[in-house]
Amino acid sequence: MASKEVTYYQVPDRYWHRIHFVRPRFKSNIENVLLYMANECCRIPKCSCEEYNSRYFNAIKMFPGNIDMADKTLHNWRTEIPALFGFYKEDKDLDITETSKMAVFLHENQDLTQFLRLFLFSFQFPGGHMKPQDLKDIIYHGIRFKPARTIIQVLMSGNRFLGEMGSEKEMSISAEEATYCIFNDVRVTSGKVTADQIAQTILDNRKKKIKYYNPKDSKSMSLTGKARSKGDMTRYAGDILDYMEIANLLEEHNGYYSMKGNELSSLNTFANDVTWFSGYESFYKKKDIETMELSKVEPLWFEYVNNSMKPELFKTDIRSIIGQSDEIDVVFEDRIKDVVTSDDRTSKDIGNLGEAIICGHE
């Protein structure tokens, strides 16, 4: 019996540009690592770049499980955390390094959900988290892209379409769909394609059973000439989707991500976001861009990101931990307020409340 021919989704070569960014080697343990490093950074006072680096490196080495790790791996941690999450600010001209507002925010609040929402809210391409050469490629392609915002807009569009078709299903997206239909298509990342069009493409592709990853496609080839695995091709979109899940914006089922139903306010904040770091705008008009000039923008980028740490923008709602809003939520919310504001609360009161929340979550 002849095998059925497989149809693959094709992004024309002229529109294909692979989005990539720093991928922490500790991603599988990101929650513990970020909380630990934020706490440790806040123990280091403003000091010379050399002293800060030394104390910062020692803190990485003391993280559980790192003591016997090779120095090369530890140094990778040292560069990845500030590149992506900006936990410290380094002024090489003045020879001063100090812990950033981002690290202080996470240290003081111990709220990784809120921290990652704020991180995702400002995360964009181009951004100072990228190497200058990669920035040049992004700018030459005319890319201006905020991943979390686009993903949420696409999911909202998909929900509307499904509702109009009378479907009770919720729109979802996989890392593979996000990679090919959003991240690596310049028409999308440069803003020439709407969220409605992207959602419709994904739904149409599902109906037609169109596949995405093709190991024989030239776009799947690495610099060595070998085909990248599906995981390699989809890892960057997958990272953002995972961060959005940890940030309690999305939930994942069998590799597909959909919006959290009780986080509408936060989701709308992302969908309606018009903020943008404009430090790279002048380079879009240039034919020849010097990497040194791009490097000068990096401190401005991290200043922008740190100034974006506004606690009032997103607040973790205890009801999102317990579940959908119903009668029991009101009881929990009232009891939480009583315990938090009471002058004569006891550790037993707090313990009982915590146990109740855990039971509700389970």
What is each residue range found by the language model?
Residues 2-325:
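Donor-sugar nucleotide-binding helix/loop cap in glycosyltransferases
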Residues 58-59, 215-224, 330-348:
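A short, surface-exposed helix-loop junction/capping segment
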Residues 341-362:
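Acidic-basic catalytic patches of nuclease active cores, encompassing PD-(D/E)XK
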